[in-house]
Protein backbone atom coordinates (compact mmCIF):
# COMPACT_ATOMS: atom_id res chain seq x y z
CA UNK A 1 0.00 0.00 0.00
CA UNK A 2 2.80 2.43 0.76
CA UNK A 3 2.51 5.58 2.87
CA UNK A 4 -0.19 8.06 1.88
CA UNK A 5 1.05 11.56 1.11
CA UNK A 6 4.72 10.86 1.91
CA UNK A 7 5.96 11.51 -1.61
CA UNK A 8 4.39 14.98 -1.64
CA UNK A 9 5.68 15.87 1.84
CA UNK A 10 9.24 15.04 0.85
CA UNK A 11 8.90 17.01 -2.39
CA UNK A 12 7.68 20.01 -0.41
CA UNK A 13 10.26 19.95 2.39
CA UNK A 14 13.19 18.13 0.73
CA UNK A 15 13.08 18.92 -3.01
CA UNK A 16 16.81 18.19 -3.26
CA UNK A 17 16.16 14.57 -2.29
CA UNK A 18 14.54 13.92 -5.68
CA UNK A 19 16.20 13.18 -8.99
CA UNK A 20 14.68 12.10 -12.29
CA UNK A 21 16.64 10.33 -15.00
CA UNK A 22 16.51 7.65 -17.69
CA UNK A 23 17.42 4.00 -17.29
CA UNK A 24 20.80 4.49 -18.97
CA UNK A 25 21.88 6.76 -16.10
CA UNK A 26 22.04 3.70 -13.82
CA UNK A 27 24.84 2.29 -15.98
CA UNK A 28 27.21 0.23 -13.84
CA UNK A 29 24.85 -0.12 -10.86
CA UNK A 30 23.54 -3.13 -8.97
CA UNK A 31 19.94 -2.75 -7.82
CA UNK A 32 17.74 -4.80 -5.45
CA UNK A 33 14.19 -4.97 -6.81
CA UNK A 34 10.96 -5.77 -4.95
CA UNK A 35 9.94 -8.82 -7.02
CA UNK A 36 6.40 -9.12 -5.67
CA UNK A 37 5.65 -5.53 -6.63
CA UNK A 38 7.12 -6.13 -10.11
CA UNK A 39 5.04 -9.24 -10.74
CA UNK A 40 1.90 -7.40 -9.64
CA UNK A 41 2.72 -4.59 -12.09
CA UNK A 42 3.36 -7.05 -14.91
CA UNK A 43 0.06 -8.86 -14.31
CA UNK A 44 -1.76 -5.54 -14.56
CA UNK A 45 0.21 -3.88 -17.37
CA UNK A 46 1.30 -6.68 -19.73
CA UNK A 47 -1.88 -7.30 -21.71
CA UNK A 48 -3.13 -8.32 -25.12
CA UNK A 49 -4.73 -5.84 -27.51
CA UNK A 50 -8.18 -6.72 -26.11
CA UNK A 51 -7.03 -5.86 -22.60
CA UNK A 52 -6.85 -9.44 -21.37
CA UNK A 53 -3.78 -10.91 -19.70
CA UNK A 54 -1.33 -12.88 -21.84
CA UNK A 55 -2.09 -16.60 -21.78
CA UNK A 56 -0.73 -19.69 -23.52
CA UNK A 57 -2.72 -22.37 -25.33
CA UNK A 58 -3.43 -24.10 -22.02
CA UNK A 59 -5.01 -20.93 -20.65
CA UNK A 60 -2.18 -20.27 -18.17
CA UNK A 61 -1.41 -16.62 -17.46
CA UNK A 62 2.03 -15.63 -18.77
CA UNK A 63 2.00 -11.82 -18.37
CA UNK A 64 4.31 -12.04 -15.35
CA UNK A 65 6.87 -14.13 -17.24
CA UNK A 66 6.83 -11.84 -20.26
CA UNK A 67 7.31 -8.76 -18.09
CA UNK A 68 10.08 -10.32 -16.01
CA UNK A 69 11.96 -11.59 -19.08
CA UNK A 70 11.91 -8.47 -21.24
CA UNK A 71 12.24 -5.81 -18.51
CA UNK A 72 15.20 -7.65 -17.01
CA UNK A 73 16.88 -7.84 -20.41
CA UNK A 74 16.37 -4.10 -20.87
CA UNK A 75 18.18 -3.43 -17.59
CA UNK A 76 21.05 -5.79 -18.43
CA UNK A 77 21.42 -4.17 -21.86
CA UNK A 78 21.93 -0.88 -20.02
CA UNK A 79 24.72 -2.49 -17.98
CA UNK A 80 22.60 -2.70 -14.83
CA UNK A 81 22.74 -5.82 -12.66
CA UNK A 82 19.37 -6.53 -11.03
CA UNK A 83 18.73 -8.82 -8.08
CA UNK A 84 15.11 -9.64 -7.29
CA UNK A 85 13.85 -9.99 -3.73
CA UNK A 86 10.72 -12.04 -2.97
CA UNK A 87 8.42 -11.62 0.02
CA UNK A 88 8.53 -14.16 2.82
CA UNK A 89 5.85 -14.58 5.46
CA UNK A 90 3.88 -11.38 6.19
CA UNK A 91 4.14 -9.86 9.68
CA UNK A 92 1.21 -10.70 11.94
CA UNK A 93 0.30 -7.00 12.05
CA UNK A 94 -0.20 -7.02 8.28
CA UNK A 95 -3.12 -9.42 8.60
CA UNK A 96 -5.64 -6.59 8.81
CA UNK A 97 -4.35 -4.98 5.62
CA UNK A 98 -4.40 -8.31 3.76
CA UNK A 99 -7.99 -8.86 4.89
CA UNK A 100 -8.94 -5.42 3.54
CA UNK A 101 -7.38 -6.28 0.19
CA UNK A 102 -9.36 -9.54 0.06
CA UNK A 103 -12.60 -7.66 0.72
CA UNK A 104 -11.75 -5.18 -2.04
CA UNK A 105 -11.19 -8.04 -4.49
CA UNK A 106 -14.53 -9.59 -3.52
CA UNK A 107 -16.25 -6.24 -4.06
CA UNK A 108 -14.54 -5.84 -7.44
CA UNK A 109 -15.80 -9.30 -8.47
CA UNK A 110 -19.36 -8.29 -7.54
CA UNK A 111 -19.00 -5.15 -9.67
CA UNK A 112 -17.78 -7.20 -12.63
CA UNK A 113 -20.68 -9.64 -12.29
CA UNK A 114 -23.15 -6.75 -12.25
CA UNK A 115 -21.81 -4.95 -15.34
CA UNK A 116 -20.32 -7.72 -17.50
CA UNK A 117 -23.36 -7.78 -19.80
CA UNK A 118 -23.97 -4.03 -19.99
CA UNK A 119 -20.67 -2.36 -19.07
CA UNK A 120 -18.00 -1.14 -21.46
CA UNK A 121 -14.68 -2.95 -21.89
CA UNK A 122 -12.95 -0.12 -20.01
CA UNK A 123 -15.35 -0.44 -17.06
CA UNK A 124 -14.89 -4.19 -16.84
CA UNK A 125 -11.11 -3.83 -17.13
CA UNK A 126 -11.03 -1.30 -14.27
CA UNK A 127 -12.53 -3.84 -11.88
CA UNK A 128 -10.62 -6.81 -13.30
CA UNK A 129 -7.34 -5.09 -12.41
CA UNK A 130 -8.53 -4.88 -8.81
CA UNK A 131 -8.78 -8.68 -8.77
CA UNK A 132 -5.10 -9.12 -9.59
CA UNK A 133 -2.96 -10.86 -7.00
CA UNK A 134 0.35 -12.68 -7.36
CA UNK A 135 -0.05 -16.38 -6.60
CA UNK A 136 2.57 -18.63 -5.03
CA UNK A 137 2.75 -20.53 -8.33
CA UNK A 138 3.50 -17.32 -10.24
CA UNK A 139 6.25 -16.47 -7.74
CA UNK A 140 7.77 -19.91 -8.26
CA UNK A 141 7.56 -19.57 -12.04
CA UNK A 142 9.34 -16.22 -11.87
CA UNK A 143 12.10 -17.72 -9.72
CA UNK A 144 12.59 -20.56 -12.19
CA UNK A 145 12.83 -18.04 -15.04
CA UNK A 146 15.41 -15.97 -13.16
CA UNK A 147 17.53 -19.06 -12.47
CA UNK A 148 17.56 -19.89 -16.20
CA UNK A 149 18.40 -16.26 -17.02
CA UNK A 150 21.37 -16.28 -14.63
CA UNK A 151 19.87 -13.48 -12.51
CA UNK A 152 20.16 -13.82 -8.71
CA UNK A 153 17.19 -13.60 -6.39
CA UNK A 154 16.79 -13.51 -2.62
CA UNK A 155 13.98 -15.04 -0.58
CA UNK A 156 13.32 -12.52 2.17
CA UNK A 157 12.32 -13.96 5.55
CA UNK A 158 9.58 -11.33 5.74
CA UNK A 159 9.04 -8.07 3.80
CA UNK A 160 10.82 -7.75 0.43
CA UNK A 161 11.18 -3.95 0.78
CA UNK A 162 13.03 -4.36 4.07
CA UNK A 163 15.40 -6.89 2.51
CA UNK A 164 16.03 -4.62 -0.50
CA UNK A 165 16.92 -1.80 1.89
CA UNK A 166 19.25 -4.09 3.86
CA UNK A 167 21.14 -5.05 0.69
CA UNK A 168 21.51 -1.37 -0.22
CA UNK A 169 22.52 -0.30 3.29
CA UNK A 170 25.23 -2.94 3.51
CA UNK A 171 26.71 -2.10 0.12
CA UNK A 172 25.61 -5.22 -1.75
CA UNK A 173 23.73 -3.00 -4.20
CA UNK A 174 23.43 0.69 -4.97
CA UNK A 175 19.71 1.14 -4.30
CA UNK A 176 16.40 -0.47 -3.39
CA UNK A 177 13.75 -0.40 -6.14
CA UNK A 178 10.04 -0.47 -5.22
CA UNK A 179 6.89 1.54 -5.82
CA UNK A 180 6.06 1.41 -2.10
CA UNK A 181 7.15 4.58 -0.32
CA UNK A 182 7.27 2.71 2.99
CA UNK A 183 10.58 1.29 1.73
CA UNK A 184 12.10 4.55 2.98
CA UNK A 185 11.19 3.56 6.54
CA UNK A 186 13.85 0.83 6.28
CA UNK A 187 16.53 3.44 5.54
CA UNK A 188 17.90 2.52 2.10
CA UNK A 189 20.49 5.09 0.92
CA UNK A 190 18.50 5.44 -2.30
CA UNK A 191 14.98 4.43 -3.34
CA UNK A 192 14.25 3.98 -7.05
CA UNK A 193 10.70 4.15 -8.39
CA UNK A 194 9.37 3.36 -11.90
CA UNK A 195 12.44 1.22 -12.64
CA UNK A 196 10.46 -1.65 -14.15
CA UNK A 197 7.77 0.41 -15.88
CA UNK A 198 7.23 -0.23 -19.59
CA UNK A 199 9.42 1.86 -21.88
CA UNK A 200 6.30 2.92 -23.79
CA UNK A 201 5.02 4.80 -20.73
CA UNK A 202 8.04 7.13 -20.95
CA UNK A 203 8.12 7.54 -17.18
CA UNK A 204 11.48 8.76 -15.88
CA UNK A 205 13.00 6.86 -12.99
CA UNK A 206 12.59 8.65 -9.66
CA UNK A 207 15.44 8.49 -7.17
CA UNK A 208 14.91 9.57 -3.56
CA UNK A 209 17.98 10.03 -1.37
CA UNK A 210 17.07 9.00 2.18
CA UNK A 211 19.59 11.20 4.01
CA UNK A 212 18.48 14.31 2.13
CA UNK A 213 14.81 13.46 2.64
CA UNK A 214 14.97 13.35 6.44
CA UNK A 215 17.42 16.26 6.57
CA UNK A 216 14.91 18.44 4.71
CA UNK A 217 12.10 17.26 6.96
CA UNK A 218 14.39 17.97 9.95
CA UNK A 219 13.52 14.64 11.55
CA UNK A 220 15.34 11.73 13.12
CA UNK A 221 14.73 8.21 11.82
CA UNK A 222 12.27 7.38 14.67
CA UNK A 223 10.36 10.62 14.03
CA UNK A 224 10.23 9.89 10.30
CA UNK A 225 8.82 6.42 11.01
CA UNK A 226 6.28 7.84 13.47
CA UNK A 227 5.13 10.30 10.81
CA UNK A 228 4.75 7.46 8.29
CA UNK A 229 2.61 5.51 10.77
CA UNK A 230 0.44 8.61 11.22
CA UNK A 231 0.13 8.94 7.45
CA UNK A 232 -1.02 5.33 7.17
CA UNK A 233 0.96 2.13 6.61
CA UNK A 234 0.21 -1.57 6.11
CA UNK A 235 0.65 -2.47 9.76
CA UNK A 236 -2.04 -0.52 11.58
CA UNK A 237 -4.83 1.97 11.11
CA UNK A 238 -4.18 5.65 11.56
CA UNK A 239 -5.86 8.44 13.49
CA UNK A 240 -8.95 9.38 11.53
CA UNK A 241 -8.81 12.88 10.09
CA UNK A 242 -5.03 13.22 10.25
CA UNK A 243 -3.70 13.97 6.77
CA UNK A 244 -0.16 14.68 5.54
CA UNK A 245 -0.05 18.33 6.64
CA UNK A 246 -1.39 17.55 10.11
CA UNK A 247 0.83 14.49 10.56
CA UNK A 248 3.93 16.55 9.75
CA UNK A 249 2.81 19.35 12.06
CA UNK A 250 2.07 16.99 14.97
CA UNK A 251 5.46 15.29 14.74
CA UNK A 252 7.26 18.65 14.55
CA UNK A 253 5.35 19.96 17.58
CA UNK A 254 5.42 16.87 19.82
CA UNK A 255 8.32 14.76 18.54
CA UNK A 256 6.83 11.27 18.95
CA UNK A 257 3.61 9.28 18.75
CA UNK A 258 3.59 8.86 22.54
CA UNK A 259 3.57 12.64 23.01
CA UNK A 260 0.95 13.10 20.30
CA UNK A 261 -1.34 10.53 21.95
CA UNK A 262 -0.81 12.20 25.32
CA UNK A 263 -1.68 15.58 23.79
CA UNK A 264 -4.86 14.27 22.15
CA UNK A 265 -6.07 12.33 25.19
CA UNK A 266 -5.45 15.27 27.53
CA UNK A 267 -7.40 17.65 25.31
CA UNK A 268 -11.16 17.01 25.64
CA UNK A 269 -11.92 19.36 22.75
CA UNK A 270 -9.59 17.57 20.31
CA UNK A 271 -11.32 16.48 17.12
CA UNK A 272 -8.99 13.49 16.84
CA UNK A 273 -9.55 10.11 18.45
CA UNK A 274 -6.75 7.61 18.98
CA UNK A 275 -7.81 4.08 17.89
CA UNK A 276 -8.42 1.69 20.77
CA UNK A 277 -5.49 -0.68 21.42
CA UNK A 278 -3.56 1.05 18.64
CA UNK A 279 -0.44 -1.09 17.91
CA UNK A 280 1.67 1.85 16.76
CA UNK A 281 4.69 0.75 18.80
CA UNK A 282 4.64 -2.75 17.28
CA UNK A 283 4.42 -1.14 13.82
CA UNK A 284 7.34 1.13 14.70
CA UNK A 285 9.47 -1.86 15.73
CA UNK A 286 8.77 -3.60 12.41
CA UNK A 287 10.32 -0.60 10.66
CA UNK A 288 13.12 -0.01 13.18
CA UNK A 289 14.20 -3.65 13.44
CA UNK A 290 12.78 -5.60 10.47
CA UNK A 291 13.26 -9.33 10.02
CA UNK A 292 15.86 -9.60 7.26
CA UNK A 293 18.78 -11.75 6.20
CA UNK A 294 21.89 -9.71 7.00
CA UNK A 295 23.58 -8.30 3.93
CA UNK A 296 26.93 -9.91 4.74
CA UNK A 297 25.22 -13.32 4.68
CA UNK A 298 23.91 -12.83 1.13
CA UNK A 299 25.99 -13.83 -1.89
CA UNK A 300 24.94 -12.38 -5.24
CA UNK A 301 26.18 -13.99 -8.44
CA UNK A 302 25.17 -13.22 -12.01
CA UNK A 303 25.76 -16.17 -14.33
CA UNK A 304 25.61 -16.93 -18.04
CA UNK A 305 22.02 -17.73 -19.04
CA UNK A 306 20.96 -21.30 -19.82
CA UNK A 307 19.74 -20.65 -23.36
CA UNK A 308 18.45 -24.16 -24.05
CA UNK A 309 16.84 -24.25 -20.62
CA UNK A 310 15.05 -21.00 -21.47
CA UNK A 311 13.83 -22.47 -24.76
CA UNK A 312 12.51 -25.56 -22.99
CA UNK A 313 10.73 -23.56 -20.29
CA UNK A 314 9.54 -20.43 -22.08
CA UNK A 315 8.84 -21.91 -25.53
CA UNK A 316 7.92 -25.57 -25.09
CA UNK A 317 6.26 -25.28 -21.67
CA UNK A 318 4.89 -21.73 -21.67
CA UNK A 319 4.20 -21.13 -25.38
CA UNK A 320 6.41 -18.12 -26.15
CA UNK A 321 7.95 -17.51 -29.57
CA UNK A 322 11.25 -19.35 -29.97
CA UNK A 323 12.75 -16.62 -32.15
CA UNK A 324 11.97 -13.96 -29.55
CA UNK A 325 13.23 -15.98 -26.62
CA UNK A 326 16.47 -16.86 -28.44
CA UNK A 327 16.96 -13.22 -29.41
CA UNK A 328 16.33 -12.10 -25.82
CA UNK A 329 18.64 -14.78 -24.44
CA UNK A 330 21.47 -13.63 -26.72
CA UNK A 331 21.03 -10.03 -25.54
CA UNK A 332 21.09 -11.24 -21.97
CA UNK A 333 24.17 -13.37 -22.59
CA UNK A 334 26.01 -10.45 -24.17
CA UNK A 335 25.03 -8.02 -21.41
CA UNK A 336 25.99 -10.34 -18.55
CA UNK A 337 29.28 -11.27 -20.21
CA UNK A 338 30.18 -7.58 -20.38
CA UNK A 339 29.90 -7.33 -16.61
CA UNK A 340 29.35 -4.15 -14.63
CA UNK A 341 31.72 -1.61 -16.10
CA UNK A 342 33.10 1.00 -13.77
CA UNK A 343 31.33 4.33 -13.60
CA UNK A 344 33.50 7.37 -14.17
CA UNK A 345 32.39 8.83 -10.85
CA UNK A 346 33.94 5.79 -9.19
CA UNK A 347 37.42 6.57 -10.50
CA UNK A 348 37.88 10.33 -10.22
CA UNK A 349 38.20 12.65 -7.25
CA UNK A 350 39.13 16.29 -7.13
CA UNK A 351 42.46 17.36 -5.68
CA UNK A 352 43.01 21.05 -4.96
CA UNK A 353 45.80 22.69 -6.94
CA UNK A 354 48.95 23.34 -4.91
CA UNK A 355 48.97 26.89 -3.61
CA UNK A 356 45.29 27.50 -4.31
CA UNK A 357 43.75 29.78 -1.70
CA UNK A 358 40.34 29.37 -0.16
CA UNK A 359 37.90 31.78 -1.73
CA UNK A 360 40.07 32.26 -4.86
CA UNK A 361 37.29 33.11 -7.29
CA UNK A 362 39.39 32.47 -10.35
CA UNK A 363 40.39 29.04 -9.09
CA UNK A 364 36.83 28.32 -7.97
CA UNK A 365 35.48 29.17 -11.37
CA UNK A 366 37.93 26.89 -13.13
CA UNK A 367 37.14 24.06 -10.76
CA UNK A 368 33.37 24.56 -10.75
CA UNK A 369 32.39 21.55 -12.82
CA UNK A 370 34.91 19.29 -11.09
CA UNK A 371 33.69 20.37 -7.66
CA UNK A 372 30.16 19.51 -8.66
CA UNK A 373 31.28 16.09 -9.85
CA UNK A 374 33.10 15.56 -6.56
CA UNK A 375 30.02 16.48 -4.54
CA UNK A 376 27.96 14.02 -6.52
CA UNK A 377 30.53 11.26 -6.26
CA UNK A 378 29.09 7.99 -5.06
CA UNK A 379 30.74 4.76 -4.15
CA UNK A 380 30.52 2.32 -7.03
CA UNK A 381 28.53 -0.79 -6.29
Curated annotation (Swiss-Prot):
Residues 358-370 have a biased composition (Basic and acidic residues). Binds 2 magnesium ions per subunit. They probably participate in the reaction catalyzed by the enzyme. May bind an additional third magnesium ion after substrate binding. Mg(2+) 2 binds at residues 180, 182, 234. GO terms for biological process: base-excision repair; DNA replication, removal of RNA primer. GO terms for molecular function: 5'-3' exonuclease activity; 5'-flap endonuclease activity; DNA binding; magnesium ion binding. CDD domains: PIN_FEN1. Residues 1-105 are annotated as: N-domain. It is an enzyme of class 3 (hydrolase). It is found in: Nucleus, Nucleolus; Nucleus, Nucleoplasm; Mitochondrion. Keywords: DNA damage, DNA repair, DNA replication, Endonuclease, Exonuclease, Hydrolase, Magnesium, Metal-binding, Mitochondrion, Nuclease, Nucleus, Phosphoprotein. Signal peptide: none annotated. Belongs to the XPG/RAD2 endonuclease family. FEN1 subfamily. Interacts with PCNA. Three molecules of FEN1 bind to one PCNA trimer with each molecule binding to one PCNA monomer. PCNA stimulates the nuclease activity without altering cleavage specificity. This is Flap endonuclease 1.
